[in-house]
Amino acid sequence: MLNNQNTQLPAPRVPVVDRDGQLMERSWYRFFSNFYNYFIALPYGSFYDTTTQTATANTPTAITFNSFANTNHTSIGIPASKIVFDADGLTTITFSIQFTNPSAADDDVYVWLRKNGVDVPYTASAVTVPKKHGSVDGSVVMTVNFHETYGPGDYLELYWITVNGDSKITTIPASVSPARPASPGVVLTVSQII
């Protein structure tokens, strides 16, 4: 954590380099070192999944991840539904999930956070995935943001329920014409803010 005794911006009269012009002045070194350690080295991660995930009707099911874009002090755990933290602090959690529904009836889906295997109160979000229209599956994207405190060794998971058992978490492959990148079924980002 911050040590206010050596992270204050040095006074204007303190030169950036020593008198010989060879080394950074100690006050400035402390400032930049602590700035890096506090702001640049904070834990973060961007995780996603490129498969199709299904669940049995009304059965809480863990959402899994098989890839990451970048991480710092966070990782995909075992099982692959766990996002594990190596440092402590208040973290912002954002997830985006792409649901599709191939059935002839609308389907309600619920998603919530679990921390260390325990459901986090008041984190469930609901969305209705529309029914198939013609030959096109119904689809909807759910995006949610939370703040939660984590410590070293803590982990988070996303759980979901599909009421009818019809909805899926679906990855859409890349396309050449029209050109567009692939769209992962689920994307989760975590960033420590304090």
Predicted segments, located by residue:
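Long, low-complexity or tandemly repetitive, helically biased scaffold regions used
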Residues: 8-12
